[in-house]
Amino acid sequence: MSDDKFDAIVVGAGVAGSVAALVMARAGLDVLVIERGDSAGCKNMTGGRLYAHTLEAIIPGFAASAPVERKVTREKISFLTEESAITLDFHREQPDVPQHASYTVLRNRLDPWLMEQAEQAGAQFIPGVRVDALVREGNKVTGVQAGDDILEANVVILADGVNSMLGRSLGMVPASDPHHYAVGVKEVIGLTPEQINDRFNITGEEGAAWLFAGSPSDGLMGGGFLYTNKDSISLGLVCGLGDIAHAQKSVPQMLEDFKQHPAIRPLISGGKLLEYSAHMVPEGGLAMVPQLVNDGVMIVGDAAGFCLNLGFTVRGMDLAIASAQAAATTVIAAKERADFSASSLAQYKRELEQSCVMRDMQHFRKIPALMENPRLFSQYPRMVADIMNDMFTIDGKPNQPVRKMIMGHAKKIGLINLLKDGIKGATAL
């Protein structure tokens, strides 16, 4: 056993781990961050959008120095069938209030910068080391074991990502429910800034965020995403883990077909593949949030299931940052009390309940169940495409009133199904 004992050991140098370390180090705590990858962020994947409000509260004006890509000013949502796209396009000027902004990011650039901020504040960082187990005395976590080394701490913060094996070893994270997870795949495709601006109708450092439902996930629970970076685009999709067994295509094949869609192919024409990644994504919402606190240990970020897929936007990093701040604040207070028991660390849950994390997780708790409706990803995109096709087809034959067009296609799904799905959607949102 080492003679050195840290105030806190953070396992994982993603967004949550780095921010937790930063906040604690600023308060003068002795903090160690351990990351199994060779650098912070090298094993992390995100679609690519950071809502700024939570990081802005910790590092005011961070975007001036952080390696963010573009500020999002164009929002698009599309229903896709194999041959068509129906798109809602919303454009606005860049928000003047920093807390209202959002940015496209690449994690292999953002995460090292965040870890650097934590190190400058006094945190210690050890990359390339895997934590094999948590050290316990009775029911209390007292440190970590990495190989033959044992490191002690008053508290351990688990920021080890979705499907936390360390959390599971404590019995805090239950066995995986496939319906609570999705598989995400992403390509980063290089284009010139001029090509990106021309193809997405943006200027300067403006950015676009685009979500897709329907054919990208082959009609299964999931969808596609596209985010513009400075000189590349992040293009990918997610598919529910519980649905993959029933899929007619592999997830990589879904991505290849998505890239060849008529609405996507011209946007990536001439681009160079820079990066390919795949990752598990938490999709269960409030239902998958595990036990967050025990004696000497807390769980933050993706490891805690803090992710919201609302259909029109996806949030993960801002919730991870808020949870990290709540955990760090709790550790600072626990040190003042010299009490790192579960009852003392329960302050973390109270901090979360007062933040956007649990308020929003609670408010949108019915969204995951809504997303399990297969009609959202198969029949509804086809219905909307067929209605639009009829509206814009002029062939010399008498046109039906639009009302009859809509009702004709709606009856294929069933008016009762439409009514039930509409009520369920309105309730969930």
Task: Give the label of every model feature segment.
Residues 6-33:
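N-terminal Rossmann-like FAD-binding beta1-loop-alpha1 element of flavoenzymes
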Residues 16, 39, 163:
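Conserved Rossmann-like nucleotide-cofactor binding loop
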Residues 27, 37-84:
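N-terminal FAD cofactor-binding segment of flavoenzymes
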Residues 96-116, 244-250:
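Short beta-strand to alpha-helix junction loop
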Residues 117-264:
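Predominantly flavin-linked oxidoreductase catalytic cores and closely associated redox partners
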Residues 216-221, 230, 243-323, 339-342, ...:
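FAD/FMN-dependent oxidoreductases across multiple families
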Residues 326-377:
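Active-site-proximal substrate-binding core of FAD-dependent oxidoreductases
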Residues 370-429:
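C-terminal auxiliary extensions adjacent to catalytic cores
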